[in-house]
């Protein structure tokens, strides 16, 4: 049984900028 640990999966996906193109989420 392998358990995948999701660590910061939110920041990793929005890093390429492919999903949200017109929106820039840099300054929180």
UniProtKB/Swiss-Prot annotation:
One of its GO terms (cellular component) is nucleosome. GO terms for biological process: cell differentiation; chromosome condensation; spermatogenesis. The keyword Cytoplasm does not apply. GO terms for molecular function: DNA binding. It is found in: Nucleus; Chromosome. Disulfide bonds: none annotated. Residues 1-28 are annotated as: Disordered. Keywords: Chromosome, Developmental protein, Differentiation, DNA condensation, DNA-binding, Nucleosome core, Nucleus, Spermatogenesis. Testis. Protamines substitute for histones in the chromatin of sperm during the haploid phase of spermatogenesis. They compact sperm DNA into a highly condensed, stable and inactive complex. This is Sperm protamine P4.
